[in-house]
Design a protein with these regions (language model features):
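Glycine-rich beta-strand-turn "strand-cap" elements at beta-sheet edges
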Residues: 1-4, 40-56, 81-108
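Short, well-ordered beta-strand segments in beta-rich or mixed alpha/beta enzyme
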Residues: 7-14, 43-75, 108
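Short amphipathic alpha-helical segments
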Residues: 19-44, 75
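Residue-level signal for secondary-structure boundary sites
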Residues: 19-21, 65-67, 104-106
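Functionally engaged cysteine thiol sites
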Residues: 34, 59, 93
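Vicinal oxygen chelate
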Residues: 63-65, 79-84
Length: 108
């Protein structure tokens, strides 16, 4: 594993039925704000086979501390209230995990 201090944030999201479009439009607005804070969206995935309404994100974040500071930036953004309301309406459940590459994995 390289000496890169970056870690990855694996986000598992379960959407409310029929709210994918609201969620996707809101994420499209919020993602650039996170990227300005040093995050990089490695990929956003929805299963072709598997749990309906699931969405998975993998973000590269500069450090574990960078997660909280970037979320503070999002909370302070002028559109934060609107984003919060859209996510409250569209997300049924969300789980976040900070992960590091394994010794046998190529780092994206």
């Amino acid at each position: 594993m390289p000496d890169d201090p970056a870690v990855y944030l694996h986000v598992k999201i379960q959407l409310v039925r029929g709210k994918y479009t609201l969620f996707a439009e809101t994420m499209a607005e919020m993602a650039p704000v996170l990227e300005e804070s040093g995050w990089r969206l490695i990929g956003a995935f929805a299963p072709a086979i598997g749990r309906l309404g699931a969405v998975y994100h993998v973000w590269r974040v500069p450090s574990p501390d960078g997660v909280l500071s970037a979320l503070d930036v999002v909370r302070g953004h002028p559109d934060a209230r609107r984003w919060h309301d859209a996510f409250a309406e569209s997300i049924a459940d969300e789980a976040l995990e900070l992960v590091r590459p394994t010794t046998y994995s190529r780092v994206p």
